[in-house]
From Swiss-Prot:
Subunit structure as annotated in this protein's UniProt entry: Monomer. Isoform 8 interacts with ORAI1 and STIM1. Isoform 4 interacts with CASQ2.
Name of the featured protein: Aspartyl/asparaginyl beta-hydroxylase
EC numbers on record: 1.14.11.16
PANTHER family: ASPARTYL/ASPARAGINYL BETA-HYDROXYLASE (PTHR12366), ASPARTYL_ASPARAGINYL BETA-HYDROXYLASE (PTHR12366:SF33)
Residues the record lists as binding Ca(2+): 91, 93, 95, 97, 102
Source organism phylogeny: Eukaryota, Metazoa, Chordata, Craniata, Vertebrata
Sequence ranges of Basic and acidic residues compositional bias: 313-324
Catalytic activity: L-aspartyl-[protein] + 2-oxoglutarate + O2 = 3-hydroxy-L-aspartyl-[protein] + succinate + CO2
Positions glycosylated per UniProt: 452, 706
Bridged cysteine pairs (disulfide): 641-648
Record key words, sorted: Calcium, Dioxygenase, Disease variant, Disulfide bond, Endoplasmic reticulum, Glycoprotein, Iron, Membrane, Metal-binding, Oxidoreductase, Phosphoprotein, Repeat, Sarcoplasmic reticulum, Signal-anchor, TPR repeat, Transmembrane, Transmembrane helix
Residues holding Fe cation: 679, 725
InterPro entries: Asp-B-hydro/Triadin_dom (IPR007943), Asp/Arg/Pro-Hydrxlase (IPR007803), ASPH (IPR039038), IPNS-like_sf (IPR027443), TPR-like_helical_dom_sf (IPR011990), TPR_rpt (IPR019734)
């Protein structure tokens, strides 16, 4: 309407303005008026488009653009990840995205910014600017040309400037520090871990043991490793591995599980940052057991991830200065050559991060074939094999990964961070398979390569402990404490060794101060166990305070029940009746045949052939206590059974005891004047039966938790030895009993087959 009104007023004005002029000028014909009305321009010029037509075309073009955009997104016609990744290389001012300021810099209208890129609070993380910017060289040329054309046009639209002739944007400014965040996540290189996305074992909740976790080394700071590589936006020439939760398979034949009461040997709680699982190697005709995977409590996990951090530890980590110390520089995993093939490495790593393990293995194998001197390609291959071993539960594949980690370390020009991570992971996986001596050699090499890294020396000390070499372990921790006297990890392990050497009072301050330090790897059930035990032996009443603290921190089921190799959910009580166990037939058989069992035991004693061996677990305060074992870890001792053939034949009828791989069947003789310290057994998976054979009338008693009982000849006592128990023999003659361990009645058949032996 406005346009039409203007046209009319224009005509009237023309008529009145000319007055009595010529008729051709003074009045317009209808045709002329129509021409003016529809063909004229609002400024009086003819021949242009009307406003209405212009608006219509504008709307058509806008709608066409909208629907085109919808079609592009809907049909996935453009790989936005790829395009955005291309735009990222033109981030000239380092603010993490491509905008008008970047365009001005590239067109020479603005000085290049030297400020640090701003990081949103949710993404804030300490990082270093890359030392060397390397253009991405492995992208297809046609994609790069297309991206450049898009960038050129976009630049000029945003700044309304003349096209810069002959300017090569890629040469003007190489790749900067922040590619797309999704790519960053996939660029992270464990796990195992651990991590490595956790692969849950295929067992029901009640079949999963309650794990007590230990962070075994102070190189824990580096051992968030092996799974995520560092974000390229912060350091494009490096990658940061992060521990994955790894659950693999244990070569049980290679590991001797020590009874927890034996204090002279550091138990093989293998593998920092991992949770141990086992695949039993069954006979080929029994495929069912081949898939048995049980989460074993002899596992080592970062305490911070698995347990509620105690107040003392919170006090330590809540300190801002302490947090600043924890922050570490992210490792650099790419050498100069690997930077030139970074795009190919990233593509292969992206497959691994997306869980396409088989494809990732093939991709890294191809990279190793093409670039045999590339440490990062070979490291990626090792990680993929590591992941594949986890996926397939294959020790054979894991052995291949261990070998590939070694190959990484043998290449020339390996970045120091990558070398350290490769060898640490190799050592970790060797321990996992029970190859303790091989792991020790790897740790020794690490210490030689990085002599100033005390965390590696702490790892080395653990390596010695795992093979029972307490003397060398002690030397290592003495060296660490001479350099860093407040190293809590070294303190608890040094105290552990002193206690194993029966230096009880001397061990207490090291164990206590080490736990109180809150350092990683110190919140370990074994250290609470041995600290409390040491205090009990010197008469320190604070022992139960530490047991209580260990219970609150999740290491013990209760103050009384302090076993560390446990299955969740099992009924827990100190004393049991035969009916409660369900093993009434076994109890009746033992009590009916107690004289037969007694006579064979006495005959073995009379032969004086040394079949009764002294107790060697350092459980006695004083006295003489010996044992004669018929079954151990579910295995019959044929030589021993020759001395008690009828007893062994009798027991063969009861698999709940002969098949108990977490217990023993044995004679136990204790002479007058013997006192056994308060102690607990290693596991809640068994119950212990005591059959009285030769019992003095008075002076012999046993306490379990807070109830004390005495033996009777021909009668069975049943208790759960995962509860604290203590024995006195103050009679005038020896005491002989027959000990029979049985599976806890609530364990399923599958658990009984699958649980590792103790």
């Amino acid at each position: 309407m406005a346009q039409r009104k203007n046209a009319k007023s224009s005509g009237n004005s023309s008529s009145s303005g000319s007055g009595s002029g010529s008729t051709s000028a003074g009045s317009s014909s209808p045709g002329a008026r129509r021409e003016t009305k529809h063909g004229g321009h609002k400024n009086g010029r003819k021949g242009g488009l009307s406003g209405t037509s212009f608006f219509t075309w504008f709307m058509v073009i806008a709608l066409l653009g909208v629907w085109t955009s919808v079609a592009v997104v809907w049909f996935d016609l453009v790989d936005y990840e790829e395009v955005l990744g291309k735009l990222g290389i033109y981030d000239a001012d380092g603010d993490g995205d491509f905008d008008v300021d970047d365009a001005k810099v590239l067109l020479g209208l603005k000085e290049r910014s030297t400020s640090e890129p701003a990081v949103p609070p949710e993404e804030a993380e300490p990082h270093t600017e890359p030392e060397e910017q390397v253009p991405v060289e492995a992208e297809p040329q046609n994609i790069e040309d297309e991206a450049k054309e898009q960038i050129q046009s976009l630049l000029h639209e945003m700044v309304h400037a003349e096209h810069v002739e002959g300017e090569d944007l890629q040469q003007e400014d190489g790749p900067t520090g922040e590619p797309q965040q999704e790519d960053d996540e996939f660029l992270m290189a464990t796990d195992v871990d651990d991590r490595f996305e956790t692969l849950e074992p295929e067992v029901s909740h009640e079949e999963t043991e309650h794990s007590y976790h230990v962070e075994e080394t102070v190189s824990q700071d580096c051992n968030q490793d092996m799974e995520e590589m560092m974000s390229e936006q912060e350091n494009p020439d490096s990658s940061e591995p992060v521990v994955e939760d790894e659950r693999l398979h244990h070569d049980t034949d290679d590991v001797t599980y020590q009874v927890y009461e034996e204090q002279a040997v550091y138990e093989p709680l293998e593998n920092e940052g991992i949770e141990i699982t086992e695949v039993t190697a069954p006979p080929e005709d029994n495929p069912v057991e081949d898939s048995q995977v049980i989460v074993e409590e002899v596992s080592i996990f970062p305490v911070e991830e698995q347990q509620e951090v105690p107040p003392e530890t919170n006090r330590k980590t809540d300190d801002p200065e302490q947090k600043a110390k924890v922050k570490k520089k992210k490792p650099k995993l790419l050498n100069k050559f690997d930077k030139t093939i970074k795009a190919e490495l990233d593509a292969a790593e992206k497959l691994r991060k997306r869980g396409k393990i088989e494809e990732a293995v093939n991709a890294f194998k191809e990279l190793v074939r093409k670039y045999p001197q590339s440490p990062r390609a070979r490291y990626g291959k090792a990680q993929c094999e590591d992941d594949l071993a986890e996926k397939r539960r294959s020790n054979e594949v894991l052995r291949g990964a261990i070998e590939t980690y070694q190959e990484v370390a043998s290449l020339p020009d390996v970045p120091a961070d990558l070398l350290k991570l490769s060898l640490k992971r190799r050592s970790d996986r060797q321990q996992f398979l029970g190859h303790m001596r091989g792991s020790l050699l790897t740790l020794q090499r690490l210490v030689q390569l990085f002599p100033n890294d005390t965390s590696l020396k702490n790892d080395l000390g653990v390596g010695y402990l795992l093979i029972g070499d307490n003397d060398n372990a002690k030397k290592v921790y003495e060296e660490v404490l001479s350099v860093t006297p407040n190293d809590g990890f070294a303190k608890v392990h040094y105290g552990f060794i002193l206690k194993a050497q029966n230096k009880i009072a001397e061990s207490i301050p090291y164990l206590k101060e080490g736990i109180e330090s809150g350092d990683p790897g110190t919140d370990d059930g074994r250290f609470y166990f041995h600290l409390g035990d040491a205090m009990q032996r010197v008469g320190n009443k604070e022992a139960y305070k530490w047991y209580e603290l260990g219970h609150k921190r999740g290491h013990f089921a209760s103050v009384w029940q302090r076993s560390l190799y446990n299955v969740n959910g099992l009924k827990a009580q100190p004393w049991w009746t035969p009916k409660e166990t369900g093993y009434t037939e076994l109890v009746k058989s033992l009590e009916r045949n107690w004289k037969l069992i007694r006579d064979e035991g006495l005959a073995v004693m009379d032969k004086a052939k040394g079949l009764f061996l002294p107790e060697d677990e350092n459980l006695r305060e004083k006295g003489d206590w010996s044992q004669f074992t018929l079954w151990q870890q579910g295995r019959r001792n044929e030589n021993a059974c020759k001395g008690a053939p009828k007893t062994c034949t009798l027991l063969e009828k009861f698999p709940e005891t002969t098949g108990c791989r977490r217990g023993q069947i044995k004679y136990s003789i204790m002479h007058p004047g013997t006192h056994v310290w308060p102690h607990t057994g290693p596991t809640n998976c068994r119950l212990r039966m005591h059959l009285g054979l030769v019992i003095p009338k008075e002076g012999c008693k046993i306490r379990c938790a807070n109830e004390t009982k005495t033996w009777e000849e021909g009668k069975v006592l049943i208790f759960d030895d995962s509860f604290e128990h203590e024995v006195w023999q103050d009679a005038s003659s020896f005491r002989l009993i027959f000990i029979v361990d049985v599976w806890h009645p609530e364990l399923t058949p599958q658990q009984r087959r699958s649980l590792p032996a103790i």
